[in-house]
Amino acid sequence: MTPIFFNQQYPTLVDICARWQLVYDANATFELRFESDTLSLHKRDEPKLDGIVVDFVTGAVAHRRKFGGGRGQSIAKAVGLKQGVMPSVVDGTAGLGRDAFVLASLGCTVTMVERHPVVAALLEDGLRRAYQDAEIGDWMRERMRLFHGSSLEALSKLAQEVDVVYLDPMYPHRDKSALVKKEMRVFQSLVGADLDADGLLAPALALATKRVVVKRPDYAEDLDGVKPNTVIETKKNRFDVYVKAAMK
């Protein structure tokens, strides 16, 4: 059971916390709120910080879907997306679902795996609103779903054939931008660093039929010390690609 603070007078919050086995704690560091049909996470000792929400419909994520470069984006190249090839993807470290959403918006079917119940609750709420949206709801229902569980367990238990496993383990950020600082400070204090991240590569390679893609900061070492087959570099990050078979 994960401790959380929330207004116990709100039936919606009571239901959400019961569903995700979140237990009320008056002294908890984090608070969940449900306002304007949106679930948000707040760090109680930093009240000036905005709440963290999962929003696939508006804001930066929607802007990237419309103007972000389509299949020319590095992440699309990394997973092998090309004309006539729409890989199925397991995102083993879903976080706020942004990379998963980019891949789904480009045509991939994506299963997001998230082990932390608070983050999973935020993802589910974001999916609920996206599924209801007139513009993106139809394809969101077809292409994006959530699997709550330990990444390691989930990757080994997912029975269906998966083309690509995508991993973006939590890594200490040097970036000083306000957004990264805010979200990473809140996120890392909520979920902690991915101390078992190296243990993800082997089950990911066992599950993926075509390739495993690992997103890393440009200064990070190779995951589990294993050299990738190819590397796609961006301004601040890189995608390490471990190829098992050709994309067809």
Swiss-Prot record:
GO terms for cellular component: cytoplasm. Its EC number is 2.1.1.242. It holds the Pfam family SAM_MT. It is found in: Cytoplasm. Its main location: cytoplasm. It catalyses: guanosine(1516) in 16S rRNA + S-adenosyl-L-methionine = N(2)-methylguanosine(1516) in 16S rRNA + S-adenosyl-L-homocysteine + H(+). Keywords: Cytoplasm, Methyltransferase, rRNA processing, S-adenosyl-L-methionine, Transferase. GO terms for molecular function: rRNA (guanine-N2-)-methyltransferase activity. S-adenosyl-L-methionine binds at R98, D99, E114, R115, S150, S151, D168. SUPFAM superfamilies: S-adenosyl-L-methionine-dependent methyltransferases (SSF53335). Belongs to the methyltransferase superfamily. RsmJ family. Specifically methylates the guanosine in position 1516 of 16S rRNA. This is Ribosomal RNA small subunit methyltransferase J. The gene is rsmJ.
